[in-house]
UniProtKB/Swiss-Prot annotation:
A Pfam family it matches: HLH
Designated name of the protein: Transcription factor bHLH19
Gene transcribed to yield this protein: BHLH19
UniProt keywords, alphabetically: DNA-binding, Nucleus, Transcription, Transcription regulation
bHLH domain sequence ranges: 115-164
GO cellular component, one term: nucleus
Species per Swiss-Prot/TrEMBL record: Arabidopsis thaliana
GO biological process: regulation of DNA-templated transcription
């Protein structure tokens, strides 16, 4: 009987033999060191490839910002599950994007600093207070104001201004008409009596007798000047009475001239300045008083 008859059947596949261990045990020291270096490099390469894969992992796409109906909305072009779509996350992303961008201009709406906003409020408050004071002052100048609102005040002020302009135009026309009247003569001439007495022995003679109807007064007006000419009988204190009477009518005497005319008559000329309130009725009163002063 054969000795191998009782041995079990097996193949080379059933032999589990670690050739690497065998080779490492049978390699020389130099070859073992070289193999260990290659193993370390292979391990480092595996780690590096793993890190590069992590770096090349797709990131969440940055959502571009678009302006629709004056509101900022985020539109995503990436449909991966890594993108956060909650409103809070969108606000955080927007804040970060704005912070990374350029500095905002100070003139844009909603970016005014608190100090500038406070100064603007104070300036606007002062402007409104000043405007209210002006309206109050204007309402005080308007007679018969029924309401104190701004619209009524402006309407009444416009009407009042038109009325005053019309009055001014009328006064200018009246003043121009008065200036065109170069002179006004108020004269009361002396009465002259002719008494003819026939005389048979000689030729007829003419007897002229002057009544006591003097003085003769003439007044002329030119713009603001008044020229008064008086022809009167010579009497004591006559000139003083005339000048005092003229000054009593608020006339400023600029010049006066007295010339004798004959033995008993004076020719008096007075130049005076009159006020704007001087009227024709006052001039008549002046002539009347001058006549009474020389009686």
């Amino acid at each position: 009987m054969d000795e191998d008859f009782f041995l079990p059947d097996f193949s080379l596949v059933d032999i589990d033999f670690d050739f690497n261990i065998y080779e490492e045990n049978n390699l020389s020291p130099d070859e073992s060191l070289s193999n260990s270096r290659r193993a370390d490099q292979s391990s480092k390469f595996d780690h590096q490839m793993h890190f590069e894969c992590l770096r090349e992992k797709p990131k969440a796409a940055v959502k571009p910002m678009m302006k629709i109906n004056n509101k900022q909305q985020l539109i995503s072009f990436d449909f991966s599950s890594n993108v956060i779509s909650s409103p809070a996350a969108e606000e955080i992303i927007m804040d970060k994007l704005v912070g990374r961008g350029t500095k905002r201009k100070t003139c844009s709406h909603g970016t005014r600093s608190p100090v500038l906003a406070k100064e603007h409020v104070l300036a606007e408050r002062k402007r409104r207070e000043k405007l209210s004071e002006k309206f109050i002052a204007l309402s005080a100048l308007l007679p018969g104001l029924k309401k104190a609102d701004k619209v009524t005040i402006l309407d009444d002020a416009i009407s009042r201004m038109k009325q005053l302009q019309e009055q001014l135009r009328t006064l200018k026309e009246e003043k121009e008409a008065t200036r065109q009247m170069e002179s006004m003569i108020l004269v009361k001439k002396s009465k002259v009596f002719f008494d003819e007495e026939p005389n048979l022995s000689c030729s007829p003679s003419v007897h002229i007798e002057f009544d006591q109807a003097l003085p003769e007064i003439e007044a002329k007006i030119s713009q603001n000047d008044i020229l008064i000419r008086i022809l009167c009988e010579k009497s004591k204190g006559c000139m003083i009475n005339i000048l005092n009477t003229i000054e009593n009518f608020q006339l400023r005497i600029e010049n006066s001239i007295v010339l004798p005319f004959g033995d008993s008559t004076l020719d008096i000329t007075v130049l005076a300045q009159m006020d704007k309130d001087f009227s024709m009725s006052i001039l008549k009163d002046l002539v009347r008083n001058l006549r009474l002063a020389m009686v």
